[in-house]
Amino acid sequence: ATSNSIFSFGAPQTSTATATGSGIIISDDGYILTNNHVVDTSSSNSSYSYYDISDATSVKVKLNSGTYGDDATYDAKIVGKDSQTDLAVLKIDKTGLTAAEFGDSDQAVVGEFVMAVGSPLGLDTTVTQGIISAVNREVESDGTKYVCIQTDAAINSGNSGGALVNSEGKVIGINTLKLSGSGVEGIGFAIPINSTLDVTSQLIDHNKVIRPYIGISGINLDDSTAKKYNLVVGVYVKTVQNFSPAEKSGLQLGDVIIKADDKDITTMDELNNIKNSHKVGDTMKLKINRKGEEKELTVTLEETP
């Protein structure tokens, strides 16, 4: 049943280059979830390499021929894309499709049996098997951090955007990255499906992801760094953007943010995670240390410009 909801697509990058990938049908009327990139590790020496789907001059979707026939190829529209989460939603003019069933990726456990479904190297609806090697694995690619499911199921060029499914055939992840290089085998990463739900909904509704922002840059202060500069542990405010929510709240250069919504913070990642749990228009409480004196500020979050 799962393979009925899998497709492959070709996205010509220039007049002489074509990239391919995989994806998942998420509605019976033609919405398809994939990555914001098309994996092509053979074209780069980087462990992670891809082309941005927005560079494509056209995108075509080929549905599972066993279900929809040999000529089931359609032009696709890019509904929305988000480079921060490496997700994109496509739309084809087709109804009566079989949508994939989602599992609960929060329940994924190490050692659990999984299958990677996609079109590696253009080999349509290929299935490889393995286990979940790790959960909540933090991976950085091109400056962006992802929290992923790690698997040893074979993931190759063209698998990107395809489904990682559990033993019930339910999608628990979007195959996204692999480590490659001499002596490296069986290290692939999938975006947990639960983390895609809100992004997918926003891409369909707004053609983009609407995120709140504060408007600062900061420096992480751990114990040793804080002691060295006679500061407290937290996030040192390095810059405050003009007319930003941070400036409007009274936050200043040199402040050290020590709590956000009553939670201790020591890194910008922690601050951003709390911020991202809010919606535009929400308020966020900050406790700061300013020249040895603690103060509380309230930031009203605005849409990222």
State what each model feature region is.
Residues 1-227, 232-233, 241-242, 268-279, ...:
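Serine-dependent protease modules
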Residues 31-36, 246-268:
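Conserved PDZ fold ligand-binding element
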Residues 57-59, 255-256, 284:
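Short beta-strand/loop motifs in extracellular/secreted proteins, especially
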Residues 283-285, 296:
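Short, conserved beta-strand segments of beta-strand-rich sandwich/propeller modules, principally
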